[in-house]
Amino acid sequence: MGTNGVHVSFGAGHEMGGVMGNGSGQPPATEYTLQGVMRFLQTEWHRHERDRNAWEIEKQEMRARIANLEGQARRADATQKALKRYVSILEKKVKEQSAALKSGGKEKGVEDEAEAEDNKTKLDRSALIQEKLRPNTKLSGAPNEAENVEIGPPDDESARNELKTFLDQCQAEFTYLMVTPANPQPPRESPPLPILDDFREGEALNQQLEQSYQRSQQSQIRDLLAQQAAAANATNVAAVQSQQQQPQQQQHAVGPRPQTNQPPKGYGELAQGAPMERSSRGQQLHDILKSGETPDWSASMQSQPVEEPTSALSKAPPMVRGDGREPAVPKSASTTDAWDFNESNFQDPNAMPQPTPQQSFSSRPDTDAFPSAENLTKSPNRGALSHRRKSSSGMARRRSAEHELSLGSLQQKAEGTMFKFRFGLRGHLDVVRTVIFSGGGSPGEPEICTAGDDGLVKRFHIPDRHIGQRNADGDLDVAADFTHRGHSGAVLSLASWSPSPNFSTGGRAQGDGWIFSGGQDATIRVWERGRVDPKATLDGHTDAVWALCVLPTNLGAIFGQTNSHGPPDRILLVSGAADGTVKVWAVSAPPQLTSPQPGPGRRGPGGRVRGNSMSSGSAFPSSPQPTTASNSPFHHTLVHTIKRANSEASPTCITALSPNGETFAVSYADAAIIVYDTRSGEEIGTMASLDTYDGTNNTAVNAVVATTVGLDQTQGPGGEDESGGGPTGGGRSMAGSGVEGTIISGHEDRYIRFFDANSGQCTYNMLAHPGSVSSLSLSPDGRELVSAGHDMSLRFWSLETRSCTQEMTCHRSMRGEGVCAVVWSQDGRWVVSSGGDGMVKVYAR
């Protein structure tokens, strides 16, 4: 600029560019350009948005803090109220205690009187007992009452001592039977599982043993009473007999064991608390008595002395219960692991299924740790199985760990097939209506074109960075490489054409292709790299252009090498507008210029160009963008104008149906889907989609895609004849004649429907989104489908199982518009979506 100033000061009348020099040495004025102003506005808008987001985050944090403090204050108030209530209760209790202490003296006198009355009652009772005992001495039949009075007291004393000794023996016997010993015999080994049949089989024998024991006890008591009666004085026989009847009554009151088959209550409690054991029949009898197998056990028992049963009982475990169930010494090594079989825990044996009695049970830990389900009882509280539970829980933990490992591997495998957010493409100021892969760039860094309501067409390159790696700005946002301007309104549709990539050029196309855009201004504009304004404009529609599609063929393949529409290498472009017409254009192909290649230092060892060898995906650096527009002329010819006879509905989407471009399908706002012939422009098929039309736009078709890959669910992966592909994926013929393939449509009523292109019948429909379906895109192999909806979500579908494999909420809703467009890259690596929030997001597996 200094040089410009010199020219201005010394050469009057010579002005350089836009510099306003006045010769006074003032600095030149700043030169403003539209692109610079727009860039400044975008930068300021993004800064404002960042500040607003930061303020929103801080606002939410402050709200959370305020809510936390309010909650703490409420808790403090509640605690204070509770403490006040507690203090009032304590004060009330103190008052009651003081009142009770004051009235304590009066109550003490009343208690003394009550104690005096009780003592008097006790004295009266003792006097009555003495009166009952005195008449017995008069029944001795002696002639002299004085002698009887003198001799009576020592005889009564001796009889009382003998009775006391007998009662002490009885009490010791019952105490031994009813009270658990302080130091029981330690258990020897873990008891096996009990079988109720063992108890029921030995019930009869146990009852026989119990009756034998009762009879022996009765005979022993009778012998003892006879000996005591013979040793007593003849003058006191009547008194001894009367006193003998009285302790027998006391014995019946304490425990009626000699009279009935029911055990004493204390003994029943002991038996209920004792551990249970399942063993062989001989072992049961050996644990009770050593001579348990002798049939005449009761006879031999009667011939033993009185002390023999006591000594035998002292050596033996607790006796058999009256109900036939046997307590035995547990075999567990720990008392905490003992069985706890309570009578209430056993169900009625008659109501339970009969297990097999002849079963052999081993004490091996490998078999005891995992018992058969048929041998398990239904009683709870199995303390002795705690070690079994531990081993079982250990096995469960091992199985759980193995299951977690298998789930982890499956989860890792599933995560490898899930798409995740990678980059955000920023730059648009309004809704982004459409997004496409332009075909430019490199395999590692493909180029994306976007357009929206701000009237701009932007080019982006997906950076070839590792997952989660951030750029120099510290975020995952990617700025636009170039911006095209020329539409006077919103840009509603995009389409691209680029030459096929070549292996010799590292996967790059031979030159850059065209970008076609349809706008609200009813024009179709053609864009090329490095040129801000459009290369050409196609006029012919009278309303907004909503759909564009480049057919995978050329003019010569459809109309022949010699035709009236132009050279055979021209591209066929199909457009649909709100005026209800569909037009087929033949446009010039871009020049086949080789894009600039990287230098020798950027090549690999074998001379092969790496996929990520260019920073921006092609030879053109991202900043600044050079002007590489060609000077080749652009020509176009209108081939067909297709208009429906009885409908003014607007076309909403266009897709090629056949891989060779001979047919294409068009969807309309009135839910119609029609297949047209490219050569003649005539309608050759109609889908049965009008059956769901209700006369409003609520059932319109928003998106349509087509594939010739067989979607038969019974068809295996190896049963297809994969062919080279156009944009629809390529594949085998489904119908065998006529129109081939399957047409998939996304509707405003939230449904996705499948139509057979040959018959036109709907073969499958599914409710796909909570909101209307806005866009569809097929994977390159034709086996997966991604759908976008205004519910702000993307859903991935398996066309073989017709099931959703992944769902993600990726955009924010803006004026009722969620995700507006979605596209799947030709290599299947990337999925790109655009939404009403002005964002373009890139996903990868």
Swiss-Prot record:
Residues 147-167 are annotated as: Calmodulin-binding. It comes from Sordaria macrospora (strain ATCC MYA-333 / DSM 997 / K(L3346) / K-hell). Residues 238-254, 610-626 have a biased composition (Low complexity). PANTHER family: CONNECTOR OF KINASE TO AP-1, ISOFORM E, STRIATIN. InterPro entries: G-protein_beta_WD-40_rep, Striatin_N, WD40/YVTN_repeat-like_dom_sf, WD40_repeat_dom_sf, WD40_rpt, WD_repeat_striatin. GO terms for molecular function: calmodulin binding. PROSITE patterns: WD_REPEATS_2, WD_REPEATS_REGION. GO terms for biological process: cell differentiation; sporocarp development involved in sexual reproduction. Residues 724-733 have a biased composition (Gly residues). WD repeats lie at residues 427-470, 486-537, 540-595, 647-686, 726-765, 768-807, 814-845. It is found in: Membrane. This is Striatin Pro11. Its main location: membrane. Transmembrane segments: none annotated. Residues 46-85 form a coiled coil. Keywords: Calmodulin-binding, Coiled coil, Membrane, Repeat, WD repeat. It is a peripheral membrane protein. Residues 332-348 have a biased composition (Polar residues). Residues 104-125 have a biased composition (Basic and acidic residues). Belongs to the WD repeat striatin family. Residues 385-398 have a biased composition (Basic residues). Binds calmodulin in a calcium dependent manner. May function as scaffolding or signaling protein. Required for the formation of mature fruiting bodies during early sexual development. Residues 97-159, 238-406, 589-632, 710-737 are annotated as: Disordered. GO terms for cellular component: membrane.
